[in-house]
């Protein structure tokens, strides 16, 4: 069933400029709007750049024939990537770097590798001091030595005559440095999910002489910790046209109000309007609720919930598969806690902590959420190996067979469910001592989690407290998203 374009969508579809930034709230039909834009410009040859292969494949089924859908790596492959095909590996190994440096200094190898990875994901034209680790991480190593090592390894990686391994990010970086001109093949580039763009991809897109349309939601930027860059706010777009899609067709007015309360903490003035029909916001799980998804801030929170439901005899569906939640790390912590380190699969804990008492002390001193959740699981679900056996027995691989679905908020981005519950491990965004940039990141994550719900949203205690405030925007000074 098709719906008429909203006035906001119509403005995007009718746009005729050279640079456009579309700020699209969760569930606002941004892909539909881009498809309509392409349909209204049938003589233009457009390129849709997707974040990953799955999004690219889905987009290809939706867009008309005048739109070519590619990931950034697919863009780089024909002219650059194919020349390195015999040297491709998934990740660079420390041993590869150490051999190339002819050194058994493993700290030098690791820091060199860190610099290389930062460079390949950056928009930088060369490996320079800005990519070096801080002085404390160098632990006595001269920064100049790390810099020279990284430059030498990069020279080997980028040369077609060398044999040093390369990753997919290597040839993408080489492609960006070649300053490709896409205007010979395309009149318009459509850049989706631009708020969490890899800086190297942003550099490729923003330097194009053809028309460029960037679409995304600043408030859904949740991968800053991985080095993601909000291309929607790039300096090169200072003079770009800007339009908004504020009508969400995913949820109704009640969930929209929660989203608006959250975003007002960041000083957002564009209000989301819920157009998805009737919805409800609750603070408690009803006694008879049926299947629902529980979204978490932490991986340990997911495991804790899954253990609780599994031990109650309920079937659990893990978004992304149970294996992706690193259950073995928790099992290692269990063996570490009872001083049976010979049964551990990995030695990370023994390398980083003197003993389990030190682990407990550091968790207490730092307030680290993942560490404290892990400690709670070990104490509540003892002995853990037996409980994990039940956990594996109660998992299902088809969501319709489950009593409950578990997922992290990060992994849930791009997904939606009728009934969503927020677990109580999200950060306290109302804490006045929290730094602004961290508060922004945590609000973004909570906003993403909140807007996964279509019909029913069950709040965590933090959001329940926020809802009780007369005006969330008065809690903190307005701030401008950067």
Each predicted region: which residue ranges?
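Conserved P-loop NTPase-based nucleic-acid remodeling module centered on helicase motor cores
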Residues: 53-120, 310-313, 317-325
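Interdomain motor-coupling "hinge/lid" segment immediately C-terminal to the ATP-binding subdomain
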Residues: 81-161, 236, 241-286, 291, ...
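P-loop NTPase Walker
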Residues: 1-87, 260, 451
